[in-house]
């Protein structure tokens, strides 16, 4: 085999260099996404703080390692449409992309029981390939990845490189935080942009200080793609914030529990990202509930850790977030639930059934 080694990029430093080869020729540079959030004056607040700590953090690629590998079955149905049984986290996205690929809207997608997902099945893997083979051969097709193929194909958790500075007063109250984060999104965008947005939006943690600034950039490289993974970027920045908070507690001379309790967000207060929290916020009560056992473990010399985190529920960041189902009485005289959400272990079928039974006179045994 004869091949030519093309210019390639494997680090963020290489991707950000002024003369760097571009992963995509049509792009001006290797930046996939950029996010900047600023409230108050973090620089001024940090400069006026009694205690200041700056630290560099790095987190690696992580594999989802779900038990069930990706699989799809496709065939022509009685309507002449290509019907795809899929195991992914977004049936509508699969429908959209397969329709674009095949150049027809005569495509249907139905999600089977997906099994584990954790974000690793957000992107298409075998669905479009099975559909294309059915389109060409007019035959039913099943494609299933082996474990090795699964590890090779689907995106991973983003590696993050973070520089963060925190300032506190003499009592351990956070005065300001400033951060720069860089993410390696690999050779394709996947969900690199939304992951970066979440990472920056929630990096400040569930605390009530008001001087915060973060600048985030996601870069294309020739590495394996990175995409959705539980926590969706917040895991990485939260790790940095919480570690820095532990270091600050040592510097101030108080426990990690105490520094979190003094800074904990309470109902009606405003987070560093500008969101006002509601009455469902229970961080203070949660910390109080573990204090006795935490203190006892410290006194006994046991290794004990403590961490706080927050993340969006649903879409968040101001985007409309609606959920719909279609309910149809079919020929079997049963009520069938049609939902675009995927069964990935969260008990979707059970919850939807419970909602119907609770709000109607329909019996459980009459629902499919």
Which residues fall in each region the model found?
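Structural alpha/beta core scaffold segments of enzyme domains
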Residues: 1-368
């Amino acid at each position: 085999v004869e091949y030519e080694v093309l210019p390639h990029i494997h680090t963020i430093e290489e991707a950000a260099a002024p003369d760097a080869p571009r992963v995509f020729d049509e792009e001006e540079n290797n930046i996939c996404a950029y996010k900047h959030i600023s409230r108050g004056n973090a620089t001024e607040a940090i400069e006026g703080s009694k205690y200041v700590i700056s630290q560099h953090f790095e987190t690696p690629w992580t594999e989802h390692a779900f038990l069930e590998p990706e699989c799809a079955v496709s065939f022509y149905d009685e309507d002449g449409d290509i019907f795809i049984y899929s195991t992914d986290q977004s049936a509508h996205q699969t429908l959209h992309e397969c329709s674009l690929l095949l150049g027809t809207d005569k495509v249907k997608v139905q999600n089977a029981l997906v099994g584990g997902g954790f974000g690793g099945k957000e992107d298409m893997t075998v669905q479009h390939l099975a559909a294309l083979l059915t389109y060409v051969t007019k035959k039913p097709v099943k494609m299933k990845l082996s474990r090795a193929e699964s590890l090779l194909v689907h995106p991973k958790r983003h590696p993050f490189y973070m520089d963060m500075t925190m300032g506190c007063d003499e009592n351990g109250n956070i005065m300001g935080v400033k951060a720069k984060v860089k993410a390696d999104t690999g050779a394709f965008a996947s969900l690199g942009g939304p992951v970066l947005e979440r990472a920056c939006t929630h990096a400040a943690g569930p605390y009530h200080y008001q001087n915060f600034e973060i600048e985030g950039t996601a870069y294309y490289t020739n590495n394996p793609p990175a995409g959705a993974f539980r926590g969706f970027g917040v895991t990485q920045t939260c790790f940095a914030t919480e570690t820095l908070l532990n270091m600050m507690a040592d510097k101030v001379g108080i426990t990690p529990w105490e520094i979190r309790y003094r800074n904990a967000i309470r109902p009606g207060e405003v987070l560093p990202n500008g969101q006002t929290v509601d009455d469902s916020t229970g961080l203070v009560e949660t910390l109080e509930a573990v204090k006795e056992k935490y203190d006892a473990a410290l006194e006994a010399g046991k290794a004990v850790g403590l961490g706080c985190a927050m993340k969006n529920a649903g879409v968040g960041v101001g985007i409309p977030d609606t959920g719909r189902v279609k309910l149809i009485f079919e020929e079997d005289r049963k009520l069938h639930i049609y939902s675009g959400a995927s069964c990935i272990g969260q008990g979707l079928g059970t919850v939807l059934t419970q909602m119907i039974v609770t709000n109607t006179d329909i019996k459980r045994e009459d629902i499919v």
